[in-house]
Amino acid sequence: MKAIADTGFLVAFGNRNDRYHAWALGIAERVTEPLLTCDAVLAETAFHLADSALVLAFVREGLVRPAFVVAEHISRLAELAARYADRRPDLADLCLVRLSELHPKHPVITTDLSDFRVYRRDVIPLIHPPGL
């Protein structure tokens, strides 16, 4: 599966007590190559899980691959930040929107539909838990 990983998915995958853990495990079983993400998502995930070592293991074991350098996309990130200023987007979301622009056929795996239904290039394809 070629996709982009958001924080909510990674937190659900790493926390067996998360309400979406079973869903995240099912998604992870379908992963055949590392999911694309960014350093901001990894930092958020480490914060929410309170476990940097686990997040580093996600990278080391090939679940995810940081595929984005902020400095290389700073102009576009600033444009996106201005465009969505009313939503107060965080850096992780801005980076994922940019990743989705760079990889338009890759859905974003997320538990955060409220933001990703607003952030759009045309329509950002999403994979999310049922019922969201």
Regions found by a protein language model. Name each.
Residues 3, 22-88, 98-106, 117-132:
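PIN-domain endoribonuclease scaffold, especially VapC-family toxins
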Residues 111:
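Conserved residues at the C-terminal ends of beta-strands
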